[in-house]
Amino acid sequence: MLNAQSLVCACYRGWSGWRAAGLLAVLLLATAISSPAQDVYFSQPFASRLHANPAFTGLFDDYSVTLSFRDQFPYLPGSFITTQLAADLRPNVPGQHHALGLLLNQDRSGTGGYTRLEMGALYAYHTRLTEKIALSGGLRVSYGRQRIAYNSFVFGDQIAADGTLSGPTAEVLDFAPVNYLSLGTGAVLYSSRGWLSLAGQHLNQPSLGFQQQSQLPMLLSASGGYKFFIVEPGAGVATREISYTPVAGLFHQGGSSRSEAGLYVTTSPITAGAVYRNILLPGGVAHQHLLVAVLGLQAGGLRLGYSYDVGLSRLSADLGGAHEVTLALRAFDRLENAHRRLKRRVYPVAPCPAF
């Protein structure tokens, strides 16, 4: 029967020419299979906000479409690639209470043939608590599929004495593809200056169905920030903003925890940020320290962001950090918003950074 140990042996025999980093990639894959799975941590959480909390659906724009690409551990053969497409819509109906969203996410590892595809539908309800404070509550229902492509491996019993490959393996390949349903919820309390986000993903802890019936553990998060304006944008079409926004967050999933704190500075049309992350991994691995550098550009309804994770610890530095690129198309009618403001029917503009 195939287990994580034989999987490592298969990878090692199949790619004996790798340098040490290649074997490390295989060990990481085997660890991921034999331990509870983890969700990807995006370095531009406000660009990928629907992934972080369904209550962000419809919070920033009348509608938006965002494409995110993340290449993690680029120094390893194949690395770990995440591609995400997110879209949300807040219909212009009386009260503007409702918003809908769609989230498509794919994780894959080129070294091990591992892929995980998740498709989610989101709904958020928005309401004003006072003239200056509003609340958004959201729900997320996702369908996921996880699989391993065995044609990426060469097992020991396939290697003849002269080093050639001979026939299929006799290993029992029992990591069948797994389908699962995941439920999540969240809330965002916000004003035009600050926000507090609370979210829980995978509340039903779906089984991933691999050999040990491992579960996808709950992801719990709490984050927030406050924006200080030097130049505050007006209600018209032509606006200019100069501001700085300190942010902080706590995240926990399975045996992994993460805390972070950072600062974003916006001088229209450019946003720059730096976020420190302290990550505690399961299995007795030492704390990993990262510094995330973010740079974004806004031009009309287009947003383009790039970030790089700089490893401050030995392991994270050896793995090469992560590159992340986001491209967003969004629409927000400032004139209509000004009209609603005059009639006291407007919500506060959420002050979260764009990236």
Where are these regions (language model features)?
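Cleavable N-terminal export/targeting peptides
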Residues: 1-39, 332-355
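Subset of outer-membrane beta-barrel
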Residues: 38-355
